[in-house]
Amino acid sequence: MNKLQEQLIALGGVFQAAVLVDRIARTGQASEADIGCMLGSLLVRDPKDTLEVFGGDDLNLRDGYRALVGALERDPSSLQREPLRYALSMLGLERQLNKRGDLLDTIGNRLPQIQSQADHFGLVHENVIASSGALYQDTLSTLRQRIQVHGDMRFLQQASNASKIRALLLAGIRAARLWRQLGGHRWQLVFSRRKLLNELYDMMRTPS
């Protein structure tokens, strides 16, 4: 796996979280497997490669890859506008988070508690989702920039959906942090668009 592929996997994680946030906001639903993959990515320690963070299978990120391709192709028919907005907002929030050692410490201190809950209850148990959502609220929600989620108020006002959305945003920002640590930069999305697309097309064709 080359460096660009590693970056695209992490960026695919950002877009996967964005797609799931949009899906829950609009329909109130997202599969447990998809949510579990993203929550699990928060708890992975010392992965052998970037794909292992997301369960070791590109299929776990297929919706994120599609949304990323749509953004890079700039084709109005395939562009997913809200997921793109959420993804770019997560990249921006991660840059703010990187300057806040106190918030990074809080996240680092509380993730082991969430891991213990996941070990006891299971990864997609409501307690684990609620704790992950609360961690987002106590840290990233305190930053100046906020992510405004648009959707159906019937679903957005349900506490369980609000927790899922916050937990997914936390996972997306974790993926954004990983992307940046792997050498990812926002200017790549503008100036290296064709190169990223060609690599993504290959990744989506080739089984992991």
Curated annotation (Swiss-Prot):
Major site of localization recorded for this protein: cytoplasm
**What does the record say about its membrane topology?**
Peripheral membrane protein
Q: Does the keyword Protein transport apply?
A: no
Question: Which residues are the signal sequence here?
Answer: none
Q: Which GO terms describe its cellular component?
A: cytoplasm; plasma membrane
One Pfam short name? DUF489
What is the top-level taxon of the source organism?
Bacteria
- What SUPFAM superfamilies does its record include? YcfC-like (SSF101322)
Which keywords belong to this entry?
A: Cell inner membrane, Cell membrane, Cytoplasm, Membrane
| UniProt-listed InterPro entries | HflD, HflD-like_sf
Q: Where in the cell is it found?
A: Cytoplasm; Cell inner membrane
| Family assignment from sequence similarity | Belongs to the HflD family.
NCBIfam families given for it? PRK00218.1-2 (NF001246), PRK00218.1-3 (NF001247)
Q: What is this protein called in UniProt?
A: High frequency lysogenization protein HflD homolog
Question: What organism does the record attribute this protein to?
Answer: Pseudomonas putida (strain W619)
